Amino acid sequence: MSAFQPTIKRRESTKIYVGNVPIGGDAPIAVQSMTNTRTTDVEATVAQIKSLERVGADIVRVSVPTMDAAEAFKQIKQQVNVPLVADIHFDYRIALKVAEYGVDCLRINPGNIGREDRIRAVVDCARDKNIPIRIGVNAGSLEKDLQEKYGEPTPEALLESALRHVEILDRLNFNQFKVSVKASDVFLAVEAYRLLAKAIKQPLHLGITEAGGARAGAVKSAVGLGMLLAEGIGDTLRVSLAADPIEEIKVGFDILKSLRIRSRGINFIACPTCSRQEFDVIGTVNALEQRLEDIITPMDVSIIGCVVNGPGEALVSDLGVTGGNKKAVIILTANVKKSVLITKI
């Protein structure tokens, strides 16, 4: 790893716990995803949650749209270890039901959860059972009066929606909560989070909502979340992709890894290749990524096709492979090298 270590001054925030996972304060930034199975299909949902846990998910969110889904949630919760967030919209009574079943966090949407008395009922239940809440504001479901006031989603509209419900929780003397202000537009989301970060001390859950497919969504999320994380904003994140949720976890860790905020597994440094390459760099990288994806120990591995940059990259990596004179050279340190035939690489 390079000796140059950038300094990111993290925003100060209070610490809460989602299950056994600390969020905020000095805790590592948590990476989470959301199931896309039918929650009433208990077997499929449990299998997906366990798959997400295997690739490093700290927290998994599960949509609970009906009372039948709430009953299924009870069975799901009994079969998994990773903390679960119940995603609640429209019917506050579902939140009360899953609270009985050991949910680790409740996500409520201010745009559709209803009157303050319903929020009070959820808060009272959460307090009694020591369950944190996420106030999840979304540009696509702002309250009608805010839509009329601002005309369209704006950073100020997202902030006002969030603060409106933060005020309710403050008034109810409930401080075990985190907040998100998501939008599909990168600049809208980033500016809303910047405003929110200045306004409150609670942990922030980051996300660019409805970001798109695997490629475009990963890029939008990397840009938006990367901007915020580099400014020290953010305590937990989800990369929202129209793809396998496992990819959300992988991309989330890749974003944190790129900013040297939190590392998990191998960080591959590979050249884009040109006619100077002495071995199949692309094939080697693809094979190693698949073969070594279960490794969780942080490690930098450089795979460079020729001697132009290969030796230099290898010296700041834990292990380097570089092409040279029709051979591949494996470099462990400046003084430990081994040449192998290209066919053996």
Swiss-Prot record:
Reactions performed catalytically: (2E)-4-hydroxy-3-methylbut-2-enyl diphosphate + oxidized [flavodoxin] + H2O + 2 H(+) = 2-C-methyl-D-erythritol 2,4-cyclic diphosphate + reduced [flavodoxin]
Alphabetic keyword roster: 4Fe-4S, Iron, Iron-sulfur, Isoprene biosynthesis, Metal-binding, Oxidoreductase
InterPro entries: Dihydropteroate_synth-like_sf (IPR011005), IspG_bac (IPR016425), IspG_bac-typ (IPR004588), NO2/SO3_Rdtase_4Fe4S_sf (IPR045854)
Superkingdom of origin: Bacteria
EC number: 1.17.7.3
Binding site for [4Fe-4S] cluster: C271, C274, C306, E313
Pathways per UniProt: Isoprenoid biosynthesis; isopentenyl diphosphate biosynthesis via DXP pathway; isopentenyl diphosphate from 1-deoxy-D-xylulose 5-phosphate: step 5/6
Protein's GO biological process: isopentenyl diphosphate biosynthetic process, methylerythritol 4-phosphate pathway; terpenoid biosynthetic process
Note on cofactor: Binds 1 [4Fe-4S] cluster.
Enzyme class (EC, first level): oxidoreductase
Cofactor requirements of the protein: [4Fe-4S] cluster
GO-annotated molecular function: 4 iron, 4 sulfur cluster binding; 4-hydroxy-3-methylbut-2-en-1-yl diphosphate synthase activity (ferredoxin); 4-hydroxy-3-methylbut-2-enyl-diphosphate synthase activity (flavodoxin); iron ion binding
The protein's role, per its UniProt record: Converts 2C-methyl-D-erythritol 2,4-cyclodiphosphate (ME-2,4cPP) into 1-hydroxy-2-methyl-2-(E)-butenyl 4-diphosphate.
UniProt record similarity statement: Belongs to the IspG family.
Name of the protein in question: 4-hydroxy-3-methylbut-2-en-1-yl diphosphate synthase (flavodoxin)
Gene this protein is translated from: ispG
